[in-house]
Amino acid sequence: MIHFTKMHGLGNDFMVVDGVTQNVFFSPEQIRRLADRNFGIGFDQLLLVEPPYDPDLDFHYRIFNADGSEVEQCGNGARCFARFVRNKGLTQKHKIKVSTSAGKMTLRLERDGGVTVNMGVPILDPAQIPFKAKKFEKTYLLQSAQQTFLCGAVSMGNPHVVLEVDDITQAPVADVGAQLTRHERFPKGVNVGFMQVVAPDHIKLRVYERGAAETLACGSGACAAAVVGQLQGKLGSRVRVDLPGGSLTINWEGEGKPLWMTGPAQQVYDGQIQL
């Protein structure tokens, strides 16, 4: 029997499993079955908490999409992870150092129940995103299905492409998102963000996530949109990002500097399941 906790960050929901005190393994098939909202638990991603690989860190954790694929980063998941390890008594710290396959992060639990995540320095080099382009540009041309899109590309530990739209409610998220998420210029696939700029400190955003379709919120997508908007001269260093599930605050002082994301993390229930 495996004990788990259902959590969400702005409606982006997770099955969180303690792999520190439990011996657990999930196959891609098991994850797909558990993620099914009709016949399983239902979630966007599974978070597996593990002991640290580095003695200077507190934990390592792994992130799996609903389709069973393992991914590098998840901003909303990072906040839920931090709240989970504190709630379950796995740590008493307010400042938690962790690693994922994308690298190291620092998480800070706030007094109001929110969590601030140091998401690291945004990766702009196309080769490291990875994105097939000759050199870094603030705006790229991306062609798909006889359409041409103006976009920005960045990695927050996972690849993102961001398109600006006039009206977020009319954005072709499902159609264009499905086209671009597997675009040949992104060898590992890509998360697709649709951004409406409201003011220099305020955007609205919808994200088609790689391996999960559109979700209510995407933390790393919010970070990517803030970066692209600032690089293109449309946004300042502090931005409120409104997603379908709620709002995040992003702080970024520019190229070469780490980006900070602040937002909520909520526990829904504890459960146990036989695999």
Curated annotation (Swiss-Prot):
GO terms for molecular function: diaminopimelate epimerase activity. Pathway: Amino-acid biosynthesis; L-lysine biosynthesis via DAP pathway; DL-2,6-diaminopimelate from LL-2,6-diaminopimelate: step 1/1. The record marks 269 as: Important for dimerization. HAMAP family: DAP_epimerase. The active site is at residues 74, 218. Substrate binds at residues 12, 45, 65, 75-76, 158, 191, 209-210, 219-220. Belongs to the diaminopimelate epimerase family. It comes from Shewanella amazonensis (strain ATCC BAA-1098 / SB2B). Homodimer. It catalyses: (2S,6S)-2,6-diaminopimelate = meso-2,6-diaminopimelate. One of its GO terms (cellular component) is cytosol. The record marks 160, 209 as: Could be important to modulate the pK values of the two catalytic cysteine residues. Catalyzes the stereoinversion of LL-2,6-diaminopimelate (L,L-DAP) to meso-diaminopimelate (meso-DAP), a precursor of L-lysine and an essential component of the bacterial peptidoglycan. This is Diaminopimelate epimerase. Pfam families: DAP_epimerase. The gene is dapF. SUPFAM superfamilies: Diaminopimelate epimerase-like. Its main location: cytoplasm. It is found in: Cytoplasm. The keyword Isomerase applies.
